[in-house]
Amino acid sequence: MTLKLYDTMAREKRDFVPADPGRVTMYVCGPTVYNHAHIGNFRPVVVFDVLFRLLRHVYGEDAVVYARNVTDVDDKINAKATAEGVEIKVITDRYLAAYHEDAAALLTLPPSLEPKATEHMGPIIEMIGELVANGSAYAAEGHVLFDTQAFPDYGQLSGRDLDDMIAGARVEVAPYKRHPADFVLWKPSKENEPEWDSPWGAGRPGWHIECSAMIDKTLGQTIDIHGGGIDLAFPHHENELAQSRCAHGAPVLANYWLHNGFLDMAGEKMSKSLGNVIIPHELLKTTPGEAIRWALLSGHYRQPLDWTPELIEQSKKALDRLYGALRRAKTVEAGESEPSDEVMAALSDDLNTPLAVSGFFELSSAIERAVTAGDELAITANKGRLLASAGLLGFLQADPDSWFEGDADDDLKAKVEDLLARRIAARTAKDWTAADAIRAEIDALGVVVMDGPAGATWRMKD
């Protein structure tokens, strides 16, 4: 089955053919660690986690190298540290740890590599030096800037033209720039800002050059896949591409450019500046990470996704249905299986996750029918296929009872099980008054009882 991916550069789906099937490389822009990441920041984390899982399934776990950087040099980080009166590393360590915690709660695999900007100053300065030496960059008033006019293909990725950029400019252009679109590779640091020595004076790098240098150092001059949110296509990815190609003379930086769409809130782009953000670090206190993950994958990754309370409720209900089928079949072991052809076909068509998850319900229905019929062979086969298919998207890896019981502690679990046993005894004795009273007692504990052919099960209320 051929994997097709939509390449932003080509403006079309293309068959994915890695340069080396034994070392498939992918780079995705990671967090700037100055605060908790919002749910929109986590959409690419989850989307490219699915691609990472798919590539590992196709080419082998050891054959895929996924790098996701950490930006730990930034004005916002400096401002946060100053406001709190602490060292910059206190801020970056705190929010990187929180980012890792949230990413794990959303069931994402850690990347193969996680390069930090502060740990790559040598390669960053070296790459800037190469650009200056070959005429692609110039020094001016303590800054080093990339000369966009020296790169004829500038604007190719985003479909922009240099002349249009001048006409559409709304900000004052620094007088030391040769062209308004020229961007900073190195800049002098202000007082109390971090700085590193360089041939152009003490200072720090611009954002774009950090990624170019880290890609080069961790993955190589040309990589298979570069991913990120669509908001990064310009200027960040456009500038990365220009820097890397000019530094090495390579014809391409990435053979495939993938971008996910925005996450909206009531039709508006979600962003910290608009104050309409959802923070997973807080949301996870009340909502299972798997439900958040389901919501993020409920639409095609290239399309905008509108985040609503209803979306989360729908995601919980979808997982309830799937875990419910697995719970009813829990006495039968799952068979060894590959993902279903339908799920593989959906994911191979530019990561069509909505179509892929629809295939889960066909398998769960088959499990339900097999349970009703007492067909253990069919249960084994379909259960194995469902778990393998869902695992490819990072779903259904929890114990079904754990999913329904949520954060219930051992004391509560024991109390509910005792009440259920007493309720069964009352129903067996046809003491309906006692049975109803026990059910009301269970309800008061925040527990929902679900009666089924295999007996009563329970779950915590939402």
UniProtKB/Swiss-Prot annotation:
Gene Ontology MF term list: ATP binding; cysteine-tRNA ligase activity; zinc ion binding
The protein's required cofactors: Zn(2+)
GO biological process: cysteinyl-tRNA aminoacylation
Annotated EC: 6.1.1.16
Subcellular locations according to the entry: Cytoplasm
Motif ('KMSKS' region): 269-273
Assigned keywords, A-Z: Aminoacyl-tRNA synthetase, ATP-binding, Cytoplasm, Ligase, Metal-binding, Nucleotide-binding, Protein biosynthesis, Zinc
Cofactor comment text: Binds 1 zinc ion per subunit.
Family: Belongs to the class-I aminoacyl-tRNA synthetase family.
Assembly: Monomer.
Protein name: Cysteine--tRNA ligase
Record organism: Caulobacter sp. (strain K31)
